[in-house]
Amino acid sequence: MKKGIHPNYDEITATCSCGNVMKIRSTVGHDLNLDVCGKCHPFFTGKQRDVATGGRVDRFNKRFSIPGSK
């Protein structure tokens, strides 16, 4: 491999919004702030988050729903 053309591969700290702190290696060069991680992601925890599904989709479904279905 050529010398001097590859980025530095350093240890950084990745901090999740749930408070989980991980030491990882990356070429980013600075610490990361994550929204979700393996300890708080709904897929891994089995818990479902409440997500507001309002707005345009609900308005569309209400407008074009067939009476008597569901």
UniProtKB/Swiss-Prot annotation:
Keywords: Metal-binding, Ribonucleoprotein, Ribosomal protein, RNA-binding, rRNA-binding, Zinc
Recorded GO MF terms: metal ion binding; rRNA binding; structural constituent of ribosome
One CC-aspect GO term: ribonucleoprotein complex
Cofactor note: Binds 1 zinc ion per subunit.
HAMAP family listed in its UniProt record: Ribosomal_bL31_1
Family per record: Belongs to the bacterial ribosomal protein bL31 family. Type A subfamily.
UniProt protein name: Large ribosomal subunit protein bL31
Organism of this sequence: Klebsiella pneumoniae subsp. pneumoniae (strain ATCC 700721 / MGH 78578)
Organism taxonomic ancestry: Bacteria, Pseudomonadati, Pseudomonadota, Gammaproteobacteria, Enterobacterales
